[in-house]
Amino acid sequence: PEDRVEEVENRLLERGWFRTQIDPYEDRYYRVWMHEIPPLRHQERGTEIDIHHRLLPRTSRLSSDPAPLFAAARPLGDPRLHVLAPADMVLHSLVHLFLEGDPDEGLRLRDLVDVHDLLCHFAQEPGFWAALVPRARELGFERPLCYGLHHAQDLFATPIPPAVLQALADAAPRWPIRQVMNYLIHHALLPGHPDHPYRWASLSRWLLYVRSHWLRMPPGLLTRHLAQKAWLRFRGYRKRIDLAQLDLKQQ
């Protein structure tokens, strides 16, 4: 929960994790508007950890109330540890697949493969399919679910009950938008090749990236944010500096 983020962050800092140095604007942007805090890195292993307190930024046009997710989370062997419920795991994957605001972490084929695997795995659990669409409606994620099921079935022949697809029929966009989105998603999912780049794939990824930002923030805030980011790039400020590497250079 969000009210425990500071406690979790401090405990990690006490146990070998450190904050990566970023521009003060970026740090404030994370902590005030986003669904996570800036990533932490382990001083020995070099691994990064993201601490999330909700699925989407506070400013997102889609509902992002995390309370239902925590309420339905399932305990693991250690009662202090929980994982999302099956339907919520699928929706979490789809939300980040279709609404990711980082151009390096956007639509990737491997992430849709993950969705396919989740659907096939949880299909064996009684009540999973019956709960999936109602849960998406409750959380406001019908559209990402609609796109995800369509493309998983189209690319991987994921076995999805017809009743589930029928229940999502009213969540699909109108025909022109549906055709454009299907085209963009299909091309954005194509694996990139450094020697033979496919320009339509790059354009599709960029357009979906713009769309994700449009959905993440109201226009006024988005304009200010993009202007600030452009100014930081103009100044030549590096997005992230590894403090461990700086320490090595100083020795």
Model-derived features with residue positions:
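Conserved NTP-donor binding/palm subdomain of two-metal-ion nucleotidyltransferases/polymerases, i.e.
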Residues: E2-Q251
